[in-house]
Amino acid sequence: MTPLLKRIPINWTAALYAGIAAGIIATMAQIILWWAFSGSLPGIMFRDARLAAAIILGPEILPMQVAFDWPAMIVATMIHFSLSVIYSMILAAFIVRRDLAVSIFVGIEFGFILFGVNMYGFTMIFPWFEEARDWVTLVAHVVFGIVAASTYRVLSLR
């Protein structure tokens, strides 16, 4: 018997590009929503970069400074895009044989589930993410799911 992933005809290249595109567009959506509704840019962006960077660099990086920090931003970006690609590859397994409309619907659901996993599941290990639980982050996760699903479907048809 062959392993499950060998039986699912996932286009891994399309999933890679879908993860990168979704990571970029979801981040842009989050920044636009912060700008429109919170008035706390760039500080909130620097906060989230430190929250992500602390996964690798440790919680000692968390004392919040409202300043750009190259090491934190580089590590946060690496984590963000690594997870974006992994999540996109997982999503691809659920939509590989679906049409575009169904894929987008699954992407929306995936975004909601991803928000729960990231903001409630991972906070058991990384409790500092609790402060990032808000509607803007939820919307960004849903945008991620929509973009990852639609981009994967379009690219996988080529």
Segments and roles (model prediction):
Residues 6-43, 49:
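N-terminal signal-anchor transmembrane alpha helix
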Residues 23, 27-28, 111-121:
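Aromatic-anchored segments of alpha-helical transmembrane domains
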Residues 39-70:
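Extracytosolic (periplasmic/ER-lumenal) interhelical loops and adjacent juxtamembrane/interface segments
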Residues 63-83:
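Individual transmembrane alpha-helix segments
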Residues 95-113:
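Internal alpha-helical transmembrane segments of multi-pass membrane proteins
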Residues 120-128:
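Juxtamembrane "helix-exit" motif on the non-cytosolic side of transmembrane helices
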Residues 128-140:
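Non-cytosolic membrane-interface motifs at loop->transmembrane helix junctions
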Residues 141-153:
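Hydrophobic cores of alpha-helical transmembrane segments in multi-pass inner/ER membrane proteins
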